[in-house]
């Protein structure tokens, strides 16, 4: 996963982001360009957490979007819907 993240994130952000993904059990999907959103978070019916981020984003926008979506996951776990 680190080698994949290296293509999309600034070098210094790869390890911390990987730790966030691992800690929160995120299934990360890097998807093709969507006009209406940069990324999204959803809890799947089986209880797993899925974060999608557009592959077309620059490294810094990708980083901000990934952290933003993981924050949605943390808020969901803390406060519920």
Residue ranges of predicted features:
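Walker B catalytic acidic pair
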Residues: 69
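Active-site-proximal or metal-binding-adjacent scaffold patches in catalytic folds
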Residues: 1-64, 73-81
């Amino acid at each position: 996963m680190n080698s994949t993240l290296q293509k999309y994130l600034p070098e210094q952000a790869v390890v911390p982001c990987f730790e966030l993904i691992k800690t929160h059990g995120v299934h990360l999907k890097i998807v093709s360009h969507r006009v209406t959103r940069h990324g999204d978070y959803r809890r799947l019916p089986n209880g797993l957490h899925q974060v999608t981020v557009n592959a077309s984003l620059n490294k810094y926008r990708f980083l901000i979007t990934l952290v933003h979506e993981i924050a949605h996951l943390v808020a969901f776990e803390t406060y519920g819907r």
